[in-house]
Amino acid sequence: IFCQLTAANPTLVKNTLQRVLKQSNMSARLAQDKNQTIDVNAQLKLRKSVAAQEELYEGAVPIYNGIAILVHRPQLEQLDQATRYIETCFQRPAQVIRETEYAWKIWLQTLPIVWEGLLAKPFNRRQLYLTSEVPGLMPLVLPKKGDQEGFELITEEGGTPIHLDLFNQHKNLALFATTRAGKSVLVSGILTQALAHNIPIVALDFPKPDGTSTFTDYTEFMGKEGAYFDISKQSNNLFEQPDLHLLTPEQQQDRLLDYSAFLESALMTMVLGSSTDNKLLSQTIRSLLNLALTAFFADQTIQKRYQEARQEGLGSMAWQHTPTLKDFLRFCSHEHLLLESVGDRVEEALNYIQLRLRFWLSSRVGKAISAPSSFSSDAPLLVFALRNLSDNEDAAILSLSAYSAALRRALSNPASIFFIDEAPILFEFDQIADLVGRMCANGAKAGIRVILSAQDPDTIAQSKAASKILQNLTTRLIGRIQPVAIDSFVQILKYPREIIARNASESFFPRKEGIYSQWLLDDQGVYTFCRYYPGYEQLAVVANNPQEQTARQKAMQHYNDKYEAISVFARQLVASLRGG
């Protein structure tokens, strides 16, 4: 859109307005005297000319305004459609006219190197406005800009870029959308940019029953940059300490206290699960676990084993002897706790702790978190797969294992991302909801950016830490939702019904022909409807339909270079999407 402003001669404009005023006044009188009728057009011109002259005498300046809209399309049919659409955007008396005779000349007039005024020649097609009216016609009105850089979305109105800077600023992000609404594609775009900014990521993934998901292929494509944790094949030591050797002794002490507090919450979940009926037993168990953790980390043998494992590194003999849950279990006894007197309640609590922890040591999930870590936690992208779990407790404990990895990352890096995908099960456990709430509320101190993905806000709102989580998810992206979920967004997140109802319409699904998904961006209470256009190669990496996965696998086998293979498959995928 090009807009050229040229000052007009105020004297000529005043004379013209006076002539219009006289003519309109005369026409109105003649209509009334001869026909006993009212000349509406003459009276309208009369009022407008009087108002314009009033503004001129008060200091307004007349300005010629030449506006041209240049439309580019690769094909003539697309150009016709685009111009017709633009014409329909303007209601009478405003009018947009498509130039078909000398469009080349108008294009030439828009160039800054051409002296000729826009729409001034060969015919003067400029419109005359006053200074109070011109700003409304200038192409200055844009959707409110967010951050200066970051993850890019395109606004639906105006088509201008709007950014979310999760990489240089601390922001927690919530993503709400139904299945097949483009959530995973958008998240992969955010995570890719985070990796480019050297920000480590810990993600919780809920794969399909066959073990495949968006992030299995994505992590595999990342090669050494990614690590996919599967409980059936690998282990992640819950008691692995963060690497704090670069910090001061005082900072090390503070970080260890934070990590001990996390372990206490994790052990409470393992021992009590989601049951909190017996508060007295719960308090006794928490007290005993706290004492046991203090004795555990104060033991010189334990400290020496931690130090040797850290020095020799992953895969060494010392690493295989790093302290784990098995070692901690020995400290949950009378001998290590040094209790002067033991009542029935304490005895019952100790027996219960021993029983539950022994159960976890014998379970599949428990074995995965009670053995030395079998993969390097230095991989920038670390994905935990929550699959083949026998019950909700397994999911909760495995998520705690992922949380421990996220906490280790946070204590060792200035910025990190913790992403939870489809996590309704986890918020049924008070301890886990508390941990996520604590991370949302206090994660800024450790540089943790929390990204939550769900289909609706119900499960989050019903959790114990709902207020901590929802109040600190200051940035939200809402895609296509189910019509039955509208009430949840209105009641829980306080969205105006007329705004959020648009997200439940059929037209809000991702547009395959345009290769984009549609989103409502809520950034600090400012609502903007946006589109996300993924890179074709980005889309090719995370496409997870069975047919798409098969085609991608064939391309990867055919080409030695994985980037060339993805590029070829991307072109095939885009062609198939646009072809329907």
Feature locations, PLM:
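P-loop NTPase motor domains
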Residues: 106-161, 206-209, 216-222, 233-448, ...
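Short amphipathic alpha-helical segments
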Residues: 65-67, 171, 380-382
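Conserved P-loop NTPase motor cores
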Residues: 28, 158-161, 166-181, 185-193, ...
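Flexible coil/linker segments and helix-coil junctions enriched in charged and small residues
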Residues: 20-51, 240, 244-253, 308-315, ...
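Conserved SF1/SF2 helicase motif Ia
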Residues: 197-199
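P-loop NTPase motor core of the ASCE superfamily
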Residues: 173, 249-307, 460, 464-580
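Short flexible coil/turn linkers enriched for glycine and charged/polar residues
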Residues: 61-63, 73, 88-95, 100, ...
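Extended, folded cores of ATP/NTP-driven motor/assembly subunits in large transport
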Residues: 1-132
